[in-house]
Amino acid sequence: MIYEFGLFYQKVVQSICEEYMWGKAKMEQKEEKKENIKKEAYMAAKEILSAAGLKKGALFVAGCSTSEVEGCCIGSSSSPEIADAVFEGIYKAVCEQGVYLAAQCCEHLNRALVLEKEAAEKYGYETVNVV
């Protein structure tokens, strides 16, 4: 009986270790994917900013679908992690250029723009709340 329990315990521990390693590998893949998305968003924003010739204080409007970044149909695979990576990449580029980032919302929010308070005040935009 003790021997059987020992084998069972060993299998449970092995299973937990495998799950941990699998989870750790998946997390590392996610982090690598997030970094790649962040770099691509940064490079794309830099290229657009360079071509647009925006002056300091201008608005740079960005709108994208995290589902499409994931390779899925719009609205079918929303991802806060992807949104975070895209934002970080684009925001870094616009800050270096000295322009404001305005993020365009989806159709559920009537394509509203989300921007920093300083930019909204500069351009005289009305502040609203969404519930």
Regions found by a protein language model. Name each.
Residues 74-80:
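Short glycine-enriched, charge-decorated loop/helix-capping segments at active-site entrances
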Residues 62-67, 104:
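Glycine-rich beta-strand-to-loop/alpha-helix junction loops that act as flexible
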Residues 97-131:
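Ligand-binding beta-strand-loop-alpha-helix segment within the catalytic cores
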Residues 27-60, 80-92:
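N-terminal glycine-/serine-/threonine-rich phosphate-binding loop
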